[in-house]
A protein has these predicted regions:
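A structural detector for beta-sheet-dominated domains
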Residues: 60-62, 79, 147, 152, ...
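Glycine-rich beta-strand-turn "strand-cap" elements at beta-sheet edges
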Residues: 64-70, 144-158
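Short hydrophobic/aromatic beta-strand or adjacent loop that forms the aromatic wall/cage
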Residues: 73, 111, 146
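Basic, often amphipathic N-terminal segments
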Residues: 1-60, 81-140, 157-171
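Generic preference for hydrophobic/aromatic residues in regular secondary structure cores
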Residues: 74, 151-153, 163
């Protein structure tokens, strides 16, 4: 959601600077899976049917930062991932039943990708540090609203292209 993007923008800039990431960082996103050579004409109606009953929801961030070597991204882990995990599981199971090949199915490690990096400093990998100023007794982390699911194509030149967007229903 664009409104909640403003909340995470300072965190994104701070992490981009700390990990020497690309200055043109993408809007934060949560990767639910990657498909190998999907047929979009076959995939689109399946996803529309799966996502039709779901409403917009929120995810709570935690202060744990991780760096993914496979996707070359700096990620911020998500707390209380029950609802998004349920959606991810339904999508992955349904796509497997329809014959799609899902490459990375890390349901336990859902995180928000904040920045793309080309070089990894070994000391900064799997770093956990406090990113927010909060009361010691009442620790609250920012929550972000998920208002749509999107299909992206990543080409060999590392350019990301939006193929289709699936907006979620209002509350």
């Amino acid at each position: 959601d664009d409104e909640y993007y403003k909340l995470i923008l300072p965190i994104q800039k701070n992490l981009s600077k700390k990990f020497r990431a690309n200055r043109n960082s993408p809007q934060p996103y949560i990767v639910l899976g990657a498909l190998e050579n999907p047929t979009i004409d076959k995939l689109s109606p399946i996803l529309e049917k799966i996502l039709k009953p779901y409403k917009k929801f929120k995810v709570e961030l935690c202060d744990s930062v991780c760096v993914s070597e496979t996707t070359k991204t700096v990620n911020l882990k998500i707390e209380h991932i029950g609802y998004i995990r349920k959606i991810s599981r339904v999508i992955n199971d349904t796509l497997k039943l329809h014959g799609f090949n899902i490459l990375n199915n890390d349901e336990d490690e859902l995180a928000i990708s904040l920045a793309n990096v080309n070089y990894f400093n070994k000391d900064k990998k799997n770093n956990s540090e406090v990113l927010y100023d909060s009361n010691k007794n009442n620790k609250t982390y920012p929550t972000l609203k998920v208002d749509r699911f999107e299909i992206w194509k990543i080409s060999n030149s590392r350019r990301e292209t939006l193929i289709k967007s699936y907006p979620l229903r209002n509350f």
